[in-house]
Structure formats: C-alpha cells, structure tokens
From Swiss-Prot:
Residues 76-82 form a propeptide. This is U-actitoxin-Avd3g. GO terms for molecular function: potassium channel regulator activity; serine-type endopeptidase inhibitor activity; toxin activity. One of its GO terms (cellular component) is extracellular region. It comes from Anemonia viridis (Snakelocks anemone). Residues 21-71 form the BPTI/Kunitz inhibitor domain. It is found in: Secreted; Nematocyst. Residues 1-16 form the signal peptide. Disulfide bonds join C21-C71, C30-C54, C46-C67. The record marks R31, A32 as: Reactive bond for trypsin. Dual-function toxin that inhibits both the serine protease trypsin and voltage-gated potassium channels Kv1.2/KCNA2.
C-alpha cells in the first residue's frame, strides 16, 4: 500500500501537471471572444480557445507561455520532437 502511494506521488511529480491543468476547458457564459489558452488533457498540449469573459475555471491562461509554464507541456503549435 505504501509502495503504491509513493509510486503515484512520484509519477505525479515527474509529469509535473498542475491539478488546475486537468480541469476541462470552459468557454464561460458571456459572449466576449478573448483569446486564451488551456491545457487539453487528451492531446497533452496547450491549445488556444475563445473565452467568453465570465465564469470559467483555473485552466484559462492569458498567454501560451503561461499555460506551458504552469502545465509543463509543449503547445499545439510547437514543433514535434523526433
């Protein structure tokens, strides 16, 4: 049991994914179109979306650089590694 707990803690730290980054993309209930970035847990990349301006959650970043820094991943527009 202790081994499993340690394994999951190490796995979580090694992937470096902030819990906020696992939240779903939420456009919000208002109708603005602010360009923002969110971490897509399916593609494991930061991707652009249009934020409505109200509501939402913590998986909402003003810049691509901020998303990559917080979530520790490449962006969708980054060149693929060989």
């Amino acid at each position: 049991m202790v081994f499993l707990l340690c394994f999951f803690l190490v796995a979580d730290v090694s992937y470096g994914i902030n819990g906020d980054c696992e939240l779903p993309k939420v456009v919000g209930r208002c109708r603005a179109r602010f360009p923002r970035y969110y971490y897509n847990s399916s593609s494991r990349r930061c991707e652009k979306f249009n934020y409505g301006g109200c509501g939402g959650n913590a998986n909402n970043f003003h810049t691509l650089e901020e998303c990559v820094k917080v979530c520790g991943v490449r962006s969708r527009d980054s060149p693929k590694e060989n």
